[in-house]
Amino acid sequence: MELLYIDEAVVVCVKPARVLSTDEPGGLPELVREALGDSQADIRTVHRLDRVVSGVMVLARSAESASELSRQIREDKFQKEYLAVVHGVPEADKGTLTDLLYRDKARRMTMVAEAPGKGVQEAVLDYEVLSRAENLSKVRIHLRTGRTHQIRVQFASRGMPLVGERKYSTLEDPCEIALWSHKIGFTHPVTGKFMTFSKEPPKVYPWSIIA
């Protein structure tokens, strides 16, 4: 568990793949407590990454800090930037993807809807292609909305599944999903200072073959 920043209000860390963001046995808050050497530490989840996704996250160290960070997320003042490697090449080097998505709870999957309806929500993201190699594209992503599996579904539905995707792709890639929480930015809940934290993906496939 890599800790990037610690103070009395927040902990910024790098979430490993296959770890839940929520506070349960083996979840990220428990791993943070172990890293801090304090099994009773107050560590609270304020935003989530899918279990299979890795990268930078912030956790609150009090109810007050959690409330303030959650407010920033609700009011779209919390910045999140992702990196992904997808199969194929987007039509444009930069653009916006907009879809209607709904959650199939029985199958535990997010699906693209053809028309508005009950449980259907708009999903919007901005992307920019950073580089290409071997019919793969590395993209930078900013979410305008935060739907479950949004990035994964929006690219997969256009024939560009993320490398390592298991749920929304039939391709068999020899790696974890290539979706990485690259950068976060938020106003510190105590000091009021705006802070940003970033971490590059590990140099493993497919990140190792695409600059």
Outline where the language-model segments fall:
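Pseudouridine synthases involved in rRNA/tRNA modification
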Residues: 1-10, 16-22, 144, 148-211
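A structural micro-motif recognizing beta-strand termini
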Residues: 87, 141-144
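Short, low-complexity Ser/Thr-rich regulatory SLiMs
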Residues: 129-132, 188
